[in-house]
Structures are given as C-alpha cells and as structure tokens.
Amino acid sequence: MKKIIISIALLLVVMANAFAQKGFLRGKVMDTEISEGLIGGNVYIEGTTIGTVTDFNGDYSLPLSEGTYTIVFSSISYNTITVSDVVIVADEVTKLDVNMDTDVQQLEGVEITATALKDSDAAILNVQKKSINTLDGMSSQTFSKVGDSNLSGAIKRVTGVSVEGGKYVYVRGLGDRYTKTTLNGMSIPGLDPDKNSVQIDIFPTAVLDNVMVYKTFSPNLYGDFTGGVVNVETKDFPTEKTTALSLGLSVIPGVQFNNDFILYKGGKTDWLGFDDGGRSLPFNKLASIPDESLVDPQLENLTRSFNPDMGVKKMTAFPSGSLSFSKGNQIDKEHVTLGYNVVLNYQNNYQFFNDFQSNRFRMDADASVNELFKEETRIGTLGKQTVMWSGLVSGAVKFDNHSYSISLLKSQSGESSAAKRVNQNFDDTNATLLEDILTYTQRSVTNGIIIGKHNFDKLQVEWRNAVNVSRVYDPNFRVTTISVSQGEPKLDGGDGAGINRYYRDLNEFNESFKADFTLPYAAQAKFKFGAIGTYKKRDFEIQNYVFDLRGISTISSNPDWFLQPENVWTPDSRTGTYVIGNFEPTNQFNANQNILGSYAMTELYLIPSLRAVFGVRAEKAQMFYTGRNNSGTEVYDNQETLNELNFLPSLNLVYSLSEDMNLRTSFNQTLARPSFKEKSIAQIFDPISRRTFIGNINLEQTNVKNLDLRWEYFMKPGELISVSTFYKLFTNHIELVSYQTNPDNVKPRNAGTSNVYGAEFEVRKNLEFIAPSMKGFSLGTNVSIVKSYVDLNSVFVDDKQQTTEYELRTKNLRDGETIKNTRPMSGQAPYLINAFLNYTMPEGDLSVSLSYNVQGETLAVVGSGLITDVYSVPFHSLSFNAYKSFGANMKSKITVGVDNILNDTKDQVYKGFNAKDQIYATFNPGTQFSVKYNYIF
C-alpha cells in the first residue's frame, strides 16, 4: 500500500511538472468577408500533426510546450496563413487572432511574420465594416482611455448619441420610447416609472465588454425602436487566467469637506445601496386613519409611528471612492473548454450643488409686453450621496459543436438627497416659503441569461432565455414647506405650505425567449429565421400622507419641530400635528404586456460587390391594464388596451466600392409603443416639479418609416471616415402636452405626423502622416446635425374643445410676432459634437486622452398657453484622462482624470419673443479630479 501511495505521489509530481512546462496558444479565426468566426478551421504547428480546430465561434485553444513555433491556419476555400516566431511561455497564454480571406480562385498561401494581436478599438471598426446594419460602438479599451466609470458617461461619445439627465440615452436626438436598450441581445425593463428607456447609469464600465449602437433595423432585431438599439455586452470569460483589483478616489472642490454640505441621517445599510427598513411605512398601508374629529387615540399612535426627522442636516462629504475586482479563466479539458468570469464593482459618490435653482416664468397677459413675468423662484442647496454596486458572474462550457453559457448580473443603487431652498412667489399671494426635501431612491436590477449555441452541419442554432427582475423604491419621500409672513413661520395652505410624505414602489418582471436559425444555401448566401416571446408585468403604487396642525398658532421654522413628542396631536389636548391619509386610487395600477415575434430574412450577394439583406418581421403585441379613477366611475380589470399585429419589412444594401470602402442604404419600418404609465388612467403628482401626469388610455402606438444612406472608408486599422444621412417619418408620434387651462397638468397624446432629417460625420485618424514624431497621436471627431418637425395643427391641447397647439400659440402671440405651423420634437438636439485627441506610446504603457462633448440648444419642455417653451442650453464638457503602466510585467497602472475642466453649468431657460432668456433650472456639477490604481495579479 505504501508503494502504491509513493508511486501515485511521484506520478502526480511528474504530471504537475509536465503541465507546468505547458503554455497555451489561444485566439479567434475570423472570416474577413463577413466578420464572423470561422467554423472548423485548422490550427497546427508547421510540419507536424499537432494542432486543433476552431469551434463554431471561431475560437481555438492549443496547449504547447515552451518554445518558439510556426503556426499554420488553413481551411477549405480560404487562403492559408502562416505565422512565424510565435513564442509560448510556460503557464502563460499567447493570444493570436487572424482574419482569413476567401480563396475563390485557389490563390497560393500568404505568409506573414508578425504576431496578429487584435486591438479592441480596431475590432469594433471591423465589426462596423462588415455588419449588415449601420452601427457605431465603443470597446472596453475606449472605456479605459476616456476614464468614465459608468455607461452614461461613456456612451455619449458615440456618434449621434446623447444622454439626458445623466441616465437616458438619445440616439439621433430620439429618446425614451424611440431608443431601445438591450443587455446581451435581450430586452430589459426600465427603472423609472416616468420613462420608457433604461437608466444606463446602472451599468459600470468595469463589467462591460463593448456597446454597439444599431442605427438601422433588420428583421432579427426588435421592432420597437426608431432612433436606435443600444446593445450592452457584459464581459465574457478571458482567454487567459486574470485577476485584477482597482481602487479609485475622486473629489470635486466645494463638495468634499464643505461645512455647508447637507444630507440627512439614513439607515445602517445605506452604504450597501438599499434601505434597512427605517424608511418604510411604519404601519400597514391598508390601515384606516381616523378623522381628527373622532378623537381616536389610534390617530396619535399612527402619527407618532413616523420618523420625526423632516429637515436637512449639515454633514461631511468624504472623497468619492470606487473599488472593483475581477477574476476569470479559460480551462481546457479533453474535448471540453470551460470558462468563468467574476466582476465586482462598488462606488460611493457625493455631489453638492450650491445656488441650485428652478423657477417659473410666463408671458404677460398684455400682448404688447415681451419680457417674461416672474411667477416663482426656488433657490437653495442640494446634497446627494449615491451608492452603487454590481456583480457579474458568468460561466460557459464548449464541446464539439455546442456551447452553453450562463450569466448573472446584479446591480443595486441607493441615492440619498437633501434639498433646502427658499421659494418666493410673485403672484397674488406674494408668499415666501421655506422648503426642506428629503428623498431616497433605491434601484435594483437582477438579470439572468442562458445562451445555447449549436452547429448541426450547415444549420446553426442560437437560443437565449433571459429573466429580469427590477425595482424602484422611494420610501419616505419627505417635503416640508413653511410659509413666512412678516417674519413669522406659518403652515398656511393658501400660500402653498404643507407637510407631505410619499412612498412610491415600482416592481417589474420581464422574461424573454429568443431562437435564431442560420442556414447557408449557396456560396456567400444564407437564410435566417427565428422567433421571440416577451412577457412584461409591472406593479406600481404611491402612498401619500399629509400632516396638518391644529390649535397651535406659533410654530418653528425647523421642520423637525412638527413631530417632536410634545407637538404631536393627542386626544386629550386635541392640538398638535396629526396625519391624514391621502391615498388616490389613480396612483396605483397593474399592467402587463405580451409580445410574440417571428422573422425571416436572407443575406446574399447580388453581384460580387453588392450585398443585400432583406426580409420581414412580424410582431403581435397586447397590453392589459388594471386600475380605476378616483371617483370609481372608470374601472379596468385586466382589460386589454392594445392589440396590434405589425409586419415590418426591411431592406439593407451594402455596396463595396473597394476592400475598405462601403456605400450603405437602408429602408425599413419600425414602431414605438406607449409605456404602461402612458396607456393608463393614472393621475400622478410630482412634488418636486409640481406637475401632474395624466395617463391616456386611448393612446395609440407610433409607426415609423426609416431611410438611411451612409458612405464609410476604413483607411487603416483604427482609422475611419464616414458620412451618413437619414430620414424618419412618424405617424401618431407621441408627445407630452400641457393642458391649456392648467399647464402644470401634462398628458401624452398622439401628435399626428412628424418628420426627422439628419446627417452624421465621423473621422478617426492617426497623425503619423504629418511627421514621424507624431506617431502615437490620434485625432477624432463626430458631428450630428438633426432637424425635426412636429405639425402643430395635429397636436391637441385639451380633451373637449379639440384646440390645437397651433391655435393656442396663435392666441398668445406677442405684438408683431409670427410663428410657423411646426416646431422641433421635444428632446431633439439640433446638433451633437464629440472630439478627442489621444496619445499612446508605441509600447502601450502610457496613454493620454483629451475629449470634448456638446449638444445644441434642445427643446426640453413644450410650453402651453402663457407658458413659453423651455430649452436646454449647450453644456460644454471637456475631460482629460491619462494612465501609466509600470512595475514588474507592467502589472500596475495609475489613472488620473479631470472632468468638466471648463467648470460649465447645466442650464435650462424659458425663451420668449424679443424677451431675455430666463432661468427655468440651473446647477453647476463642478470640476471633478480623480485617481485610480489598478493591479493585475
């Protein structure tokens, strides 16, 4: 027995030693023509039988002993590629990616002697070059260069892409329902009850591999997009074993260690991005709240159960910080390849806005007066703390012609904010109001996706099943407004004073299944078909509570005073503060949506230089709604509110003017559906903007016809010149319209016919052609110019009289003013400009980047009656980022960055005829300085 143990031990030592001498050659073999992985390609050592074949993704892995080799890549009907001087190091992975050209004339093999490592930015351009769609994108390498910590900062550098409110993507000036975001090719729900689009700031760049923005439709894509589809790809497992850790700090002068910074005491788990329960409603939401006149002791108990903190507190803002960790590997077994990837990311950020303000102006009732009348100013300070963490765990197994992968993504964030402002009314009340606002918003997304890929001789099958669970929870939204009259604080409701608490909860479940089939039927021709099913369910409710005061004439201006024990109403005293239930049935609804889709398309060459992709997609959509109005006269119980069957044709043509130059054209039909909230009878009051959203159960979906033309020239790896034009025709375009009689009430309406025209230009160029000393420098810019037109005669501003927006605007013209019968679409930027200047040392251990972004004056809020339009003023964003690698094997890296170098402010202004622009809202985000350290183990 002892000899057996010794023998086994010796065998293990020998095996371990032998394995230690092994290294790996890994990479991907691509078909140059179609930019897809080459299936069944041969990879072997020249002059031997030692080798392997590529899988159906074009990937290969070849274990080799330490040494230098000549590697041969071959496949039937392709030019053979020979790569010399490939060095294999024990226990390390050598990456070698190659592109193979079709050998239609049986040309002789081509030999190269350089290592064909693929650059990530160049790879994105190669995908653009070979794609059947017009698209733009960003790689993880670009994320590193520009230094953005989350997707909302990074994606605005893509041609024609802007970000509204730091969260919402607009493609070609079209946002919300007109831009769709997918995660790993599958639909995901949004995290805002007021928006259709996904809040992209939930995606830290640390977990992302690339982002592709599809600007033209093809039948294999979702039909409900118009501006574009933003597909976010999370990191796949690496080709070699990697472990990395990064730590970051950032400061904004005037935020950190500022004695005036405000917030409030939160919960014990705020640092984890979720509430510990201390902000939850302290009693059952169905509990009956007695009327004060009943002198019921239960009223006192319920009032005292609320957290008494109502005012902001001065606190310390520490430097913002980030922490990320990643670990991944690819493991080769006999006939099986395993892989895994784990990415963890944590961020804690502070913001402080001094002199933050939002105001209300309107036109004078006298048409001879051009200057705008000041109705109300709201000026104060705002402090924020945002905690966000995410975790990505993925694994995959590949064997023969099959692979399976699973990916789990969890993103959690919590945002605390405190605002203290002075509101001054200039209307009939002329009141001065002191306002404290305390909020907490908790957002979470849990995404799981399983992907299977199979190659059955010629037939390729890919299926995906994705499940998403998301929640937006606003517990204990507190607003205390105190009026001041002759220096004395009062709780005068006539002046707009009051005490309110809101509890808002949105839960959404989304499951999608998708199957795609690809069948080649001729040389360079294939037929694709597939199907998809998507189910969405949303539950939404708001609980609203008002506090009143009885029998006390002298109060404090401190919001915490009202719920101090001695100031709470009791049955004996019948004086003090007490709670009033204010639940409105219209603030609660349930809705669901079913979508079944299928498509068929073909891709073929009509002539050697002209590729055509055409087909049709069918989508059947149903929406159901459960809810009621406040009076109970309208009741919906899982009632169908939408039932549409649409056929969406598409034609894409790609003409190769040369090997590196394409001319593209595309014609297709897409659509946009109303959101759950829009297609409802909900009436939801926003205590911050003081606007009431009113749903429209009769809202119809929007149908869009799209025409695109693009010329592109890929000069060298990483270099590009492109020019695009596009046109979009909207039928039943959806606009958020203010009521004629009450501009603070807004309702979504179908706005008839609208048109969008645009052009895009992009150039990326290395500057070595100027002089050899410019090697490593690169310059790039992209510009989008967009014009949109909404027919004012097709937009109705009331329900009964059918008054059009054009009639209402004409009625309120100033003397000498004339208007057109069209205006821009809301949110449509007339131009977008991005520019960058990069320097990267040939060794790649030093990179410096200066980037600039701006978008033109944009219609932000559509005016109504005497309320004029509100426009966003161009914000000039100039950023600097640099990193330096150092240490043993360059495993350490220091990154420094500066954002908003120009210290520009974000402004929105009222615009009137021959009138001075007046501030609607303004704040200064400040200049941020950051430093980050990365280490690769």
Residue ranges and their predicted role:
Residues 430-451, 583-596, 642, 671-730, ...:
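Outer-membrane beta-barrel signature, preferentially recognizing the C-terminal barrel domain
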Residues 499-506, 515-521, 526-527, 651, ...:
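Conserved C-terminal beta-signal and adjacent last beta-strands/turns
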Residues 725-729, 747-858:
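Gram-negative outer-membrane beta-barrel transporters
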Residues 186-187, 421, 471-473, 490, ...:
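Surface-exposed extracellular loop regions of Gram-negative outer-membrane beta-barrel proteins
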Residues 48-59, 696:
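Short, acidic Ser/Thr/Gly-rich low-complexity loop/linker segments typical of extracellular
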Residues 87, 117-170, 176, 185-203, ...:
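Periplasmic N-terminal accessory/gating domains of Gram-negative outer-membrane beta-barrel systems
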Residues 305-419, 443-450, 649-651:
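Transmembrane beta-barrel wall of Gram-negative outer-membrane proteins
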Residues 30, 41-44, 74-76, 89, ...:
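Short, acidic, small-residue-rich periplasmic hinge/interaction motif at the N-terminus
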